[in-house]
A protein has these predicted regions:
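Dinucleotide-binding Rossmann-like beta1-alpha1 core, especially the glycine-rich loop
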Residues: 48-122
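Hydrophobic/small residue at the entry helix of a nucleotide-binding pocket
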Residues: 12-13, 37
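Active-site/ligand-binding neighborhood in enzyme catalytic cores
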Residues: 89-227, 231, 238
Length: 407
């Protein structure tokens, strides 16, 4: 008998498996329909010995000390600050838009104060910010919106920015300085030996059993368990009772080239007529040294594995119906991007999983106290319980993982 069946071995499922096993002493079975752990963050060494991300670039960044220290139990880190260029008008320009972007695009020599005035002069103020188009046009005007955002967003989401919630483009800042970092989070780093090795360390516990190439529907009636943690698509769980929730998918084209460097930045965006949205060169991300280099093209599409919930009002309304079903389903916990139909970053999923663990473990401990009290022992009614949850004030030393380079 397992205490928990966890569906999905990505961040949400793996964090909860580790916490329940190591933190609460529970027996956990975690399954995944794919042939590997790690979810979309899975990485591996290709035939040339280069570490690549199978499902596109995954850049770790967070402002949460708790999340960073928790993951540091399972990996050492390679310091990395992400940078992106956009191919616009035949030039490779920094994105998010900053002072250098404007000066190079228009052949100007503005200062930080002057570029702020420039943005104000081209901005088209919107009385209400409802859509992704509103966000950008209100901030930097129509021309920059057309050059950097419109086509990229249409390719990525299959919809015009005027049809998408403001949240999509609100994630991308506009800067008046020369800061070319894509993120400004306190903690920016990549797992030194890759994400997969980190997940292996996370799931390396005697209370955890992993089953791959396994659909949970095939085992839930034959393997006994007490509760389920589900990280897959919520509409699938309920057999599409209210219809299928739309997700965007991706197709990846991986290539290896016989030269050390392919492009001048880790990622180059193509907000124009190319079918792909961006090209990523992995050695920038991993810090690996190799005579060859590997890249990946990303082609957004409507069908395929679900990657991104589509942020539109009508979709949120359908999800609300599924959430009501989820809340009313006993002994099943819905966690992660697909199960809660939200566009989470990796650190946000880890934080959600840690919070879920605290709630589960706290509730179980409180139930145990009540049972003890009912038997004449333990705390008396009305006695306050200490705060329950996980503290990670110390970074535990990761196990030695060997040499990162397999070239």
């Amino acid at each position: 008998m397992f205490d928990y069946l966890i569906v999905g071995a990505g961040f949400a499922g793996s964090v909860l498996a580790e916490r329940l096993a190591a933190g609460a002493g529970k027996k956990v079975l975690i399954c995944d329909k794919r042939p590997h752990i790690g979810g979309n963050a899975y990485d591996h060494y290709n035939d040339s010995g280069i570490l690549v991300h199978k499902y596109g670039p995954h850049i770790f960044h967070t402002n949460s000390r708790e999340v960073f220290e928790y993951l540091s139990r399972f990996t050492e880190w390679h310091s990395y600050q992400h940078r992106v260029l956009a191919c616009v008008d035949g030039q490779l320009l920094p994105i998010p838009i900053n002072l250098d972007t404007i000066n190079k695009l228009y052949g100007l020599n503005l200062t930080s104060f002057q570029v702020e005035d420039f943005f104000q002069s081209v901005a088209e103020p919107r009385a209400q910010i409802r859509t992704s188009e509103d966000v950008v046009v209100n901030r930097v005007g129509r021309e920059l919106y057309e050059k950097f955002f419109r086509n990229y967003t249409r390719k990525q989401w299959g919809l015009d920015p005027s049809e998408l919630d403001a949240s999509v483009t609100a994630r991308v800042p506009t800067r008046t300085n020369r800061d070319q970092r894509y993120f400004t989070d306190t903690y920016q780093a990549m797992p030194l030996h890759g994400y997969t090795r980190m997940f292996e360390n996370m799931l390396d516990h005697p209370n955890i059993k992993v089953m791959l190439n396994t659909d949970y529907n095939e085992i839930e009636r034959v393997i006994p368990f007490r509760e389920m943690i589900y990280t897959g698509p919520v509409d699938t769980f309920f057999d599409y009772r209210y219809g299928k929730l739309p997700y965007r998918s991706l197709e990846f084209k991986h290539e290896t080239h016989g030269r050390e460097v392919f492009q001048p930045a880790p990622v180059v965006n193509y907000p124009n007529e190319q079918l792909y949205t961006r090209i990523t060169e992995f050695k920038y991300l991993t810090g690996q040294e190799h005579a060859k280099t590997s890249i990946v093209y990303e082609f957004p599409q409507a069908e395929g594995d679900p990657y991104y919930p589509v942020p539109r009002k009508e979709n949120a309304e359908v999800y609300a119906k599924y959430k009501a079903l989820a809340d009313a389903t006993p002994d099943v916990h819905f966690v992660g991007r697909l199960a809660t139909y939200k566009y989470y970053n990796m650190d946000q999923i880890v934080a959600q999983a840690l919070t879920t663990y605290s709630k589960i473990h706290g509730a179980r401990r409180q139930e145990a106290v009540i049972k003890i009290g009912a038997n004449g022992g333990g705390l008396r009614a009305g006695t306050s319980l200490p705060a329950l949850g996980m503290t990670t004030t110390t970074i535990a030393t990761a196990r030695p993982l060997g040499d990162v380079s397999r070239s």
